[in-house]
């Protein structure tokens, strides 16, 4: 694991649920890659999670990764809460099922492939990486909204 990748992620949703987009900006050495996508009906949390998941999935080899997110839900979920969810068979302490368990499980499987540091950054502030990820997420959301408009 000799390569270090810095990733900025964000999600955007119009309504909750509603059309949403996700975006990620990856930096490796002197190279940057932008990725984004959308879902026609989703939530802001699912888009935040999908941005991180898709960014991790495109890494070709085991890496040291810093992921910057403005989602406390994502950061706390993957670093703190997930351990109890796994022990409780994907249920919370009140026995209610964990929301977005499908995505949490996919993210958890990525943890074994990389050394990941999850870092929170204030959203819509002066962090250029977060601003770029937000623009990508908004682009995804706008794509979803255009498709829905065409579908009538």
From Swiss-Prot:
One of its GO terms (biological process) is DNA replication, removal of RNA primer. It comes from the Bacteria. Keywords: Cytoplasm, Endonuclease, Hydrolase, Magnesium, Metal-binding, Nuclease. Pfam families: RNase_H. It catalyses: Endonucleolytic cleavage to 5'-phosphomonoester. Mg(2+) 2 binds at residues 10, 134. Disulfide bonds: none annotated. Mg(2+) 1 binds at residues 10, 48, 70. SUPFAM superfamilies: Ribonuclease H-like. It is an enzyme of class 3 (hydrolase). Its main location: cytoplasm. The keyword Membrane does not apply. Residues 1-142 form the RNase H type-1 domain. One of its GO terms (molecular function) is magnesium ion binding. Binds 1 Mg(2+) ion per subunit. May bind a second metal ion at a regulatory site, or after substrate binding. Its EC number is 3.1.26.4. The keyword Ion transport does not apply. Endonuclease that specifically degrades the RNA of RNA-DNA hybrids. Belongs to the RNase H family. Monomer. This is Ribonuclease HI. It comes from Rickettsia prowazekii (strain Madrid E).
């Amino acid at each position: 694991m000799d390569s270090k990748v810095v990733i900025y992620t964000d999600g955007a949703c119009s309504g909750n649920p509603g059309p949403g987009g996700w975006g990620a900006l990856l930096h490796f050495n002197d190279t940057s890659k932008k990725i984004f996508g959308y879902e026609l009906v989703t939530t802001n949390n699912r888009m935040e999670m999908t941005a991180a998941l898709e960014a991790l999935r495109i890494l070709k080899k085991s890496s040291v990764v810093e992921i910057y997110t403005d989602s406390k839900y994502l950061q706390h979920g993957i670093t703190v809460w997930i351990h109890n969810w796994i022990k409780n068979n994907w249920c919370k302490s009140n026995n209610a099922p964990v929301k977005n368990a499908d995505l949490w499980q996919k993210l958890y499987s990525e943890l074994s492939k990389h050394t990941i540091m999850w870092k929170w950054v204030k959203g819509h502030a002066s962090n250029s990486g977060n601003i770029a990820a937000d623009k990508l997420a908004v682009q995804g959301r706008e794509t979803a909204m255009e498709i829905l408009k065409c579908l009538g």
